[in-house]
Amino acid sequence: MLRTRLLILVGFVAALVPGVALGFWLHDEGTIDYKRGSSTVEFVTTQKKPEQKRPRAVVLRLPWPTYGLRVQRTHTAADFDIRPPYRLRWTFKAHHVLEFPPSIAYGRLYVAQQRGRFFAVHHRTGKIVWQRRFDHCSASSPTIAYRVVYHAWMQPLPCNRFPRSQPGMITAMAARTGKLIWRFDAGAFETSPLVIGRTLYAGSWDHKLYAINIYTGKPRWTFTADGEINSSAAYSSGKIYFGTDAGSLYALDARTGRQRWRAQALSRFGRREYFYATPTIAYGRVFIGNSDGTLYAFGASSGRMLWAQRAGTYIYTAAAVWRGRVYVGTYDGYFMAFNAATGDRLWRFSASSAVHGAPSVIDGLVYFAACPACGSVASRYSKQGARGTYALNALTGKEVWHWPDGVFSPAVADSQHLYIVGRSRIFSFAPKHRAHPARQEQQKPKRKKQGRRSAARSDTTSGTPAPGTSARR
């Protein structure tokens, strides 16, 4: 009899535990991760704003010199007057996956495909100016400074077949010729380098953030974090910010490498998920998404958590910041805008697939891509559908334009052209109704005839305006 009662009790407990665990999980998912912020606490509006324009000479020479455009990684370009409808100018084939977008300087696009080929592509023709082959994989954007291209590399080829302890490297190449200037060997790098002054910063799978002399390729200092670093470093007011796979966000003194503060993601059952996303610095705050689907705002000076907003199943994308709004996408197929001060959601757009790569705000439109394969083996929901690039009105979230290719971080630009990054191709677009400034005077006498020829060619224009919307809204 006693044995029977014990068996019944054990069975009851066994049935109860999963239910209790599920209850905790749902409670944790639904309520714990939300904290509303305030515009009166560590919200700085007197600093240089993300949408502030740069000097014209800088825009022409270095239109998009690094991942996220600026050292704060804001992914916002206010310098360009580029909107649809577009005319397709050229297509460049990289022959393998382009996981990160190119950087643009000196009239060239600099980009690496996943299997070790690095290209310099002419911005007007789409032709290869030079290329190099390396025996390492790539999942980052280069950064360009002082006519040198710096790029970080992961483990040796073939990709994803070596343990994560395999070595990586950073290379410095002459922007004009591609000549190798120096090479720094360390752990594998899945981060886009950042150059501040004479120092390059990059985080590695070996848990270290390296500060490297850009002239010699020798380390100035090294900081050891609590986990792998996939998050590219961002800079503001003398500090370097980055996240780790252990769920920590660090702020270091850029000159000395000394830790200024460390913040952490909220935990579930005693563990934290990771910060794969690159932090974005604006308004005296650090905005960063966690792989648990939570978007955070931390004080850039204090490290204090100011707000935390539940956004979706996973966040791998860096955020873009523009006019008091924070833009981010999730693996359950939503793209959203949040109030930068409070964390309140302003609008939400449903895409065809998971959103994995960083958005870009260009001339009031926010561009992002839908990734059909991202998260296909994930434990939480990941939306599977068609791939493509969306352009939404950044104020309202209404769709303005669509392009059928695009998987990761799809859009960069210079003063004349928009570049959309597909799975393995780059597409160059120009606005249909604007002549090139260098030829504008020559074209004036032939405006009517040229207009008719342009109209005849408009059938070749790619990209789809959204029904019932104006591209200028």
How would you name each of these model-derived features?
Residues 15-26:
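Hydrophobic alpha-helical membrane-insertion segments, chiefly the h-region
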Residues 1-15:
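N-terminal Sec-pathway targeting helices
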